[in-house]
Amino acid sequence: MREKIASAITDSLYKNPGLIALVIAIIVGLSAWQMSKLTINYNQLELIPQSLPSVLATKRMFKLAGGYGHLFIALRGKDVPRMKLVADDLTAEIKKIPEVRSATCRQDVSFLRDHLAYYVDIDDLNEAFRLLRKKIRSMTREKLGMKSDDTETDEDLKKLFEKYRNVNSKFVDDEYNIDPTREIILIVIQANGIPNDLDFSKKLLSDVSSVIEQYNRGNPRGAKLREKDGDGPAPEATITYGMTGEYKIAYDDSAQMKNALKPASIVAFIGILIYLVILFRRPMQIILLMTTLVMSIVITFGFTRITLGELNTITAMLGGILMGFGIDFGIHFMYRFKDEYSHRGDIYESLRQTILHTGLSSLISAATSSASLFVLVLAAFKGFSHFGLIAGAGILIIAIMMYTFLPVAILLLNRYWPNFTKSLVVNYREIDDADHLNKPYPFASRILAASLLLTIGLAYFATRIEFDYDSRTSVTGNTQALMLQDEIEKRFGRKGLPSIVYTDTLDETKKLYDELSNKDKYSYVQQVVSIFSLAPPMEQQLKTRQILDQIQERLVEIPANLMTGEDRELFDIVKKSLAAQPFTLKDVPEDLLKQFRPVPESGEKGYFTLIIPKGSVTDSKQTVEFTKQVGTITVDGKNYYATGHMILMANLAMIVIRDGKIFPALAGVLILIILLISYRDPRALVFAMAPLLGGMVWMLGLMYLFNWKINYVNIVVLPVVLGYGISIGIFIFNRYLESHSVMFALRHTGAAVAGSCITTVIGWASLFFSGHKGLTSMGSLAVFGISGALLVALTVMPSLMQYTEDKKILIPKSKA
């Protein structure tokens, strides 16, 4: 049956090379046309399942709030009055940008400052009363001329005030968004878009930068603005500025990934080209291989345009990867064809034998490799599912092209350039002489025993491999925006990006606020900011008033003339706060209330509740736990869904971790099924799967020893290594089945296997030049896995075949 199929394919190629070449040229031309219309969708929100409650809530929040996310401009300098003037000027200009919904550098906090005492916990208020009495006694002794060394009371009072100087994420001692050290002023921008829409983020950042540059040229305040993030304020009149927030961080990572892929693809192409020159040393053969490869990539991206319509931030990296992976089929074809032609001198028969034997191996290899990728199509995360579809289809397309266009090109060249076939002849005398001796593979038992011990040892470490929950290991790295974000969190006491819950009525908002105030149940919540956090319960306020009355009685004992500097400012704030009477929401200024209400154009009348998480936004383990607690909140039988950047990223993390456990296992099962169908002999699986299993175990074991971890980006490599590991074993094993000579299989196929592996490694290793942590981790994982599979294929697998042949056990059938 195989003979008939191989003969039929060979006849078609041999008799109609011109027609087939024309058809391929038309397909490539149409694919190039489609590829020219291919775009990259940078909206990462669309990669997450759109049916998730958090995604639906995000889309609704976009309508209610007119967008979500923030862009922060941090102004840094020594001249605080000048900084405030510059902040006011820039804020006014930024508000004119069409993409900007609001921009603020200050807010009237007089109400919060005057009622500060009512936002203090009762226990802390009692502690303040105790410290105040102690302070009065100390000051009385000083007034009488007695020495007092009570500095601890002053420090404790300052710490207590510092704890409550930030009410509802607003500092009450200054209307400007200025940090306690008075070195940084923040301009907070809310835009009419989402950070995941990278085209929108790019436009927003560009417009804001243009406003700052134009303002700097006019220089109305005599300030010198320059973009630089660093430690400490700038000297003299210079004000440095930096941008951060969800818009900036998301865009920087995507832009740097995009820029990183260009040199990586170039390095992959040049690296593969150089290696092919070393491997074949014949310019025309290299041109044929590279031309076929490039045409295959064009067809693949044309297929992508037709089926998916666009690339995303994950699939945009496939060009270089497919180059390294796909060239393998061409290398195996050329090696086998040259082998056959050098011995037979007949193009037709050489082509038929190549298709019959290497073509079968390539078919099984392409089927298993693509199957291991096609399983990703079932993934909920579109970054993975699209990657699986494009990469799986790309492998099949390249394999088909290598066994159609390459033969056709050789036949046409032979027709119009008869001397071309002379370049295909190789002197195989030394190999032929070695074949006649038919020596066994040396040291098979020792290699098998040593590799078995090594594999067992590495398997132990492989089981201890961990998942890296730090999302920064999957992005560009510590960019200026990320470092500035960290600094802002520390200086302004903001531990993470807030998530938002929308409620339709004031009653629902109150119940939600009370529910989230349960600190034991919501242990990953640092703070809940609601319209009701602006007006504490009246019962609590009345208790507070009683304590304040006691404090007021004692406050008159403090000599005001002894208060200076910070103590005087603190004294004035406390004194005014003590005089304030209990209040309700009706007394709170509208400027403070409107931040909790939808934009007027939404037509909705509900309220927002902000949930501020503990920990860093980059610690995905904490964001996952936070999301498990607040992602869905049930109050009186009704579900409320939180949304925000952290919630979306946590959902992505959970999907990736779940898919990462399921799909490698599915790929393994699918590979087993394909091999059983192909060989119809379970014994063959022992040999064919040796490189796969060995490569995976060695890869994971070495990763642990090098202290590397699985992360959100490199996890997609696991199915790739599975497919490639089985591919390596198939070519060697099928050659072994032809002769049942281990050394014959290695001599005639080993070089092609090694060459194909090296080109693939070059493709993945090109990611080392990306400067992107996520891409570099992908390259590292793939290089480890493929190199491990190659080492197993050239040492352990031959030893296993030789050992079983000597012992006459597990001997498979002679034909696949």
Region spans (language model):
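Alpha-helical transmembrane helix bundles of large polytopic membrane transport and channel proteins
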Residues: 23, 85-185, 204, 224-230, ...
